[in-house]
Swiss-Prot record:
Annotated catalysed reactions: (2R,3S)-3-isopropylmalate = (2S)-2-isopropylmalate
EC number(s) on file: 4.2.1.33
HAMAP family (alphabetical): LeuC_type1
Record's subunit section: Heterodimer of LeuC and LeuD.
Binding site for [4Fe-4S] cluster: 337, 397, 400
Essential cofactor(s): [4Fe-4S] cluster
Alphabetized UniProt keyword annotations: 4Fe-4S, Amino-acid biosynthesis, Branched-chain amino acid biosynthesis, Iron, Iron-sulfur, Leucine biosynthesis, Lyase, Metal-binding
Superkingdom of the source species: Bacteria
One BP annotation, GO: L-leucine biosynthetic process
Protein name: 3-isopropylmalate dehydratase large subunit
Protein purpose: Catalyzes the isomerization between 2-isopropylmalate and 3-isopropylmalate, via the formation of 2-isopropylmaleate.
Length: 462
């Protein structure tokens, strides 16, 4: 019987262990940031251990970065974590994309942009959205601080092999529907736990026709569906994305010959298989307090089916039967490792251009990396957003999570292009609605959610 992409990647990296038991995997790339690395570095010091492979470790600042003024760090804990990463990287010989560096940004954007993320690798990071890197035909997953220390010391990690799931996605996306809507649809349909215990491969016509940035959006949220890993087979689109980047292989043609073997064999079988027709999708909006609680734009919010729904409605200040258009928005956030890439900003700017943010909305655009910010400014996107009344910020995780100054006030509804809508995720009492960048942009200039499939409703002015 043939092998799945996941089987091939996993088998390449097993150092020790029997099938059915935890196995020791070799780690090709360890990405770190300021929040989950200090304890691990301190553990090395206490045991007087060296960092085994500094050359396979790369650091950046993202979670705590104040995006209004990156050097004005008011929070003492955040400042201490940032200073600790600077000290630790210098002491242990780790390359750091420091504050203000041309390479600084959200860790899951910096890896691909620099060419560190490549097909065939096992990539780990102390962050749950490490599945993003699976879009390149890699195994990427998040780890805890104790595991970060283990990788520091050994360049390996113990893992129980998950089962395999294949999600076949075919059909052309309708106008106004994006990669973000695909993953929100999957989670709303099958739940936040359907991927638990699985490594998911997304494939099919729809995936083949996507850019790398769109593919990363889908893999980024594999964890929201319960899966530890999400991945896609590398193809010519992947190879051309990697080609010419700072850390791309010196012999690309040799690398490509190897990468071309990283695909599921025709006679391979997944432990679970799901099919999806992308041509019938609508723009999605979440109404509740986990990504499963989402609906197509044309649908009303569902009836209460259990205590979780009851609590979610109470927290969000909403009721069954309401629609997304009725939500009283106060904030719009375009950013995060899910949707802060150049193509995301270009699509948002296309909708925003020539319009104005409504008076009831505070709107932020936070590029995911310095590279994206520079590229956006080179083609005038910053001017489009600023002329419309958006705040144009420095790169960082920003309003995706309440760990920096960018937070949504208590009780305020926010249209967000991020990946999680948990209680308090964007700040104490914040009410988060997950959407695509286009939906967020249209909401900012209309003052509420609209059906972006109807061009006539995209109009601005205060």
């Amino acid at each position: 019987m043939g092998k799945t992409l996941f089987d091939k990647l996993w088998n390449r990296h097993v150092i020790y262990g029997k099938e059915g038991e935890p196995q020791l995997l070799y780690v090709d790339l360890h990405l770190i940031h300021e929040v989950t690395s200090p304890q691990a570095f301190e553990g090395l010091r206490m045991e007087n251990r060296p960092l085994r492979r500094p050359d396979k470790t790369f650091a950046t600042m993202d979670h705590n970065v104040p995006t209004e003024d990156i050097f004005n760090i008011q929070d003492l804990v955040a400042k201490k974590q940032i200073e600790a990463l600077q000290t630790n990287c210098e002491e242990f010989g780790v390359t750091l994309a420091d504050m203000g560096s041309d390479r600084q940004g959200i860790v899951h954007m910096v890896g691909p942009e620099t060419g560190l993320t490549q097909p065939g690798k096992v990539i780990v990071c102390g962050d749950s959205h490490t599945a993003t890197h699976g879009a390149f035909g890699a195994i990427g997953f998040g780890i805890g601080s104790s595991e970060v220390e283990h990788v520091f010391a050994t360049q390996t990690i113990w893992q129980q092999k998950p089962k395999s799931m294949g999600i076949e996605i075919n059909g052309k996306l309708p106008k106004g529907v994006y990669a973000k809507d695909i993953i929100l649809h999957l989670i709303a349909t099958y739940g936040v736990a359907f991927g638990t215990g699985y490594a998911v491969e997304y494939y099919g016509e729809t995936i083949r026709n996507m850019s790398m940035e769109e593919r990363m959006t889908i893999c980024n949220m594999a964890i929201e569906g319960g899966a530890k890993m999400g991945m896609m087979a590398p193809d010519q689109t992947t190879f051309e994305y990697v080609r010419g980047r700072e850390y791309a292989p010196s012999d690309m043609e040799k690398a490509i010959r190897d990468w071309e073997t990283l695909k599921t064999d025709p006679d391979a079988e997944y432990d679970l298989h799901i099919e999806m027709d992308a041509s019938i999708l609508e723009p999605y909006v979440t109404w509740g307090t986990n990504p499963e609680m989402g609906v197509p734009f044309s649908k009303a919010f569902p009836e209460i089916k259990d205590m979780n729904y009851e609590r979610a409605y109470e927290y969000m200040g909403l009721k069954p039967g309401q629609t997304a258009e009725e939500i009283e928005l106060g904030y719009v956030f375009i950013g995060s490792c899910t949707n802060a890439r150049l193509s995301d900003l270009e699509e948002a700017a296309r909708i925003v251009k020539g319009n104005k943010v409504k008076n009831n909305i505070r709107a932020l655009v936070v590029p995911g990396s310095r590279q994206v910010r520079n590229a956006a400014e080179a083609i005038g996107l910053d001017k489009i957003f600023k002329d419309a009344g958006f705040e144009w910020r420095e790169p960082g995780c920003s309003m995706c999570l309440g760990m920096n100054p960018d937070q949504v006030p208590d009780g305020v509804h926010c249209a967000s292009t991020s990946n999680r809508n948990f209680e308090g995720r964007q700040g104490k009492g914040a009410r988060t609605h997950l959407v695509s960048p286009a939906m967020a942009a249209a909401a900012a200039i209309n003052g509420h959610f609209i059906d972006i499939r109807k061009e006539a409703v995209i109009s601005g002015g205060n």
